[in-house]
Amino acid sequence: MVNTNKLRGKMIEHGMNVEELSLALGMNRATFYRRLNSDGEEFSIREADMIVNILKLKKEEANAIFFSQFVA
């Protein structure tokens, strides 16, 4: 499960909204919203990697967002 609250927070920190990030990913805005609302369960590894690069996330930030259920 993706920590979508942290993802949304990082988007805001980088001055990006859903529409801008979905455009940068080459994804339809509605599709991106659906993935956010499903706790990110439908994000592919490729999409997660692209998000990490677009938002310039550090390793710890990426782990906290995309691997939150595995990190104690």
Regions found by a protein language model. Give the residues of each.
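A short, Lys/Arg-rich alpha-helix, primarily the initiator
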Residues: 1-17
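The alpha-helix within a helix-turn-helix
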Residues: 11, 22, 52
